[in-house]
């Protein structure tokens, strides 16, 4: 079936959600106010929602809600500000923000869509609030287990040894054989902006290297942002992953049975170097209503064939 790509749609409403602890979460609504509600969960953590208009969602049938997770994008305080308190930014703070946003916008149930880190947050939310989720649409699957995090920031270095050596060299010499993520956290909490900026550039150089070597990899995908955005992204990312995203090991796969009755698509790339397809496979086995698609011509970014599968699911879900 030929899946449509719709005319660009921008927001019809923007606003800020006051979380009650000094944070303000930016959100926007796109499409039809009377449409089927969707919440789009961005990656990173710390990347912020994309600024580009939506094309895959029918703006006459869907009400798409995008938001910037704490301390990134247009949410305040921004993570580039050393005064932003990272102790108030955890997976479970973000889950609570999503539920608070749903209530604020008067949504009964919504389709939850996420990619990469957004899959982790989408699953954490859906497993805590399954009665509020109509469907799940998950791409480039990552559940932020310790083993996945260790693969991304250590194991993948077997394929990119020169880039990983540069990443490792970004921390003080006496910390290079220890916990690299904790070392980067310390650098990102430095009062010296130059130290934070250098560490952010080193971290994002590694992320770029991993994705550039994949099919359809985009050079500069992570580093192509201004310095404040780089600092916020890496500060948040290092903070989350050094804490194992405040999840028990394999928690989101282990508890996937809580999603029974929620239909969903699990779409991932066969050649995803950062988030290998094993996790998507295990998740789909544990989730009774999941449909798994592994795209043979995709990495983390995806491909046109994978996007067709995703758009088919979007078209299917709008009629449920």
For each predicted feature, which ranges?
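N-terminal cap/lid segment of alpha/beta-hydrolase-fold proteins
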Residues: 3-24, 237
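Conserved alpha/beta-hydrolase "acid-adjacent" motif
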Residues: 273-279
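Catalytic active-site module of serine/aspartate enzymes centered on a nucleophile-bearing elbow/loop
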Residues: 290-320
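Conserved hydrolase catalytic core segment
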Residues: 108-147
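Conserved acidic catalytic loop of the alpha/beta-hydrolase fold
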Residues: 92-110
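Conserved HGGG/HGGXW glycine-rich cap/lid loop of the alpha/beta-hydrolase fold
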Residues: 18-78
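Short beta-strand/loop motif that positions the catalytic acidic residue
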Residues: 259-260, 266-268
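Alpha/beta-hydrolase
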Residues: 151, 155-255, 262
């Amino acid at each position: 079936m030929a899946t449509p790509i719709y005319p660009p749609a921008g927001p019809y409403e923007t606003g800020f959600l006051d979380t009650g602890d000094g944070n303000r979460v930016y959100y926007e609504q796109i499409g039809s106010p009377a449409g089927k509600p969707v919440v789009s969960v961005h990656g990173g953590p710390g990347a912020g929602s994309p600024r580009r208009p939506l094309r895959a969602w029918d703006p006459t049938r869907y009400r798409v809600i995008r938001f910037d997770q704490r301390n990134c994008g247009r949410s305040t305080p921004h993570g580039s500000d050393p005064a932003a308190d990272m102790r108030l930014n955890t997976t479970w703070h973000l889950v609570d923000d999503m539920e608070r946003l749903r209530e604020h916008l008067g949504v009964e149930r919504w389709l939850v869509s996420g990619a990469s880190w957004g899959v982790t947050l989408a699953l954490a939310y859906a497993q805590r609030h399954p009665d509020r989720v109509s469907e799940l649409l998950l791409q480039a699957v990552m559940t932020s287990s310790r083993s996945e995090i260790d693969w991304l920031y250590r194991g993948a270095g077997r394929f990119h040894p020169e880039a990983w050596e540069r990443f490792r060299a970004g921390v003080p010499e006496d910390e290079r054989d220890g916990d690299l993520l904790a070392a980067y956290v310390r650098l990102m909490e430095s009062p010296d902006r130059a130290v934070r900026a250098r560490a952010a550039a080193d971290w994002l150089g590694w992320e770029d290297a991993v994705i550039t070597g994949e099919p359809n990899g985009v050079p500069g995908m992570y580093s192509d942002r201004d310095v404040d955005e780089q600092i916020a992204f890496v500060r948040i990312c290092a903070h989350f992953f050094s804490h194992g995203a405040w999840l028990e090991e394999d928690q989101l796969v282990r508890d996937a049975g809580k999603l029974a009755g929620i239909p969903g698509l699990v779409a991932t790339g066969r050649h995803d170097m950062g988030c290998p397809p094993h996790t998507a496979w295990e998740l789909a086995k544990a989730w009774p209503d999941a449909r798994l698609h592994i795209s043979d011509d995709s990495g983390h970014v995806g491909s046109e064939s994978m996007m067709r599968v995703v758009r088919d699911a979007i078209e299917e879900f709008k009629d449920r």
